Curated annotation (Swiss-Prot):
It comes from the Bacteria. It is found in: Cytoplasm. It comes from Flavobacterium johnsoniae (strain ATCC 17061 / DSM 2064 / JCM 8514 / BCRC 14874 / CCUG 350202 / NBRC 14942 / NCIMB 11054 / UW101). The keyword Oxidoreductase applies. It holds the Pfam family Semialdhyde_dhC_1. It catalyses: N-acetyl-L-glutamate 5-semialdehyde + phosphate + NADP(+) = N-acetyl-L-glutamyl 5-phosphate + NADPH + H(+). The active site is at residue 135. The lineage of its organism: Bacteria, Pseudomonadati, Bacteroidota, Flavobacteriia, Flavobacteriales. Belongs to the NAGSA dehydrogenase family. Type 1 subfamily. This is N-acetyl-gamma-glutamyl-phosphate reductase. Keywords: Amino-acid biosynthesis, Arginine biosynthesis, Cytoplasm, NADP, Oxidoreductase. PANTHER family: N-ACETYL-GAMMA-GLUTAMYL-PHOSPHATE REDUCTASE, CHLOROPLASTIC-RELATED, N-ACETYL-GAMMA-GLUTAMYL-PHOSPHATE REDUCTASE, CHLOROPLASTIC-RELATED-RELATED. GO terms for molecular function: N-acetyl-gamma-glutamyl-phosphate reductase activity; NAD binding; NADP+ binding.
Amino acid sequence: MINVGIIGGSGYTAGELIRILMYHPKVNIDFVYSTTNAGKPLSVAHHDLMGDIEMNFTAEINPNVNVVFLCLGHGKSISFLKENQFASHTKIIDLGNDFRLNKDAHFEGKDFVYGLPEINKAEIKKTNYIANPGCFATAIQLALLPLAKHNLLNNDVHINATTGSTGAGVSLSETSHFSWRNNNMSHYKAFEHQHLGEIGESLVQLQDDFDSELLFIPNRGDFPRGIFATLYTLCDDSLEQLVAKYEEFYKNEPFVTVTTTNINMKQVVQTNKCIISLLKKGNRVLITSIIDNLTKGASGQAIQNMNLMFGLEETTGLHLKPSGF
């Protein structure tokens, strides 16, 4: 069995990790670390776990676990790792943004690999250290990578993506209160969202002359989980040619489905799936990409990476079905 530790155990991504890992056939959850809830049952923070798992939060870490998931606020993983040493064999998967960019990937002798399996699977299998991608970054990259592979990203890309309230984290803020978020929408960080950097680096990895603008408008939705992203750009390929290229690119990727039908977010919520829909009008291509921000956009993808790191089928423990209604 793979002994797992979870750091920052009170948040949404940690709760999603626990929800999936408690049924993973190859995993034992060794500890869930939270200084604020130490000694209390996991169900104090994760009410959906009541009656399903008898385990308490702890303020002590086991440095000898096989893998540790860092579910800390952005910028906090570095300080945690400086203050807490793990065994040399312990694999680390960081769900924050501390190590995602190339310039940040090397830390105290550890080289973090960007954990997007659809382009970095071989490297993920060999590494002990993963920088898990951001949620928006995952949906957007999966929408664009086949175009980059064929050097078709030669014009500005217009991106509009809406995320659920869980994307803001468990701590309350002015824009996460029910009275503000319900029956409401707003955009934020227009043209300057922090995920743009990691998206750009992955696109250049496949299309080395990529220098077009990614004009990204992120939106806050009034639903709890999921990302619905629409992207459009110019492309001379026919719809049939594009579908063939996308299907070829993702033919060995079990969590990505390509279609030309209309799609809706409920098709992926609470799963590790990404569904991509293609539409063509003249020389414009519309790409719609949907994921669950907590699963494929965070915890599910982290488990997918863990599976690859330990030589398991990447789908192990991730055969999850959306409710659809």
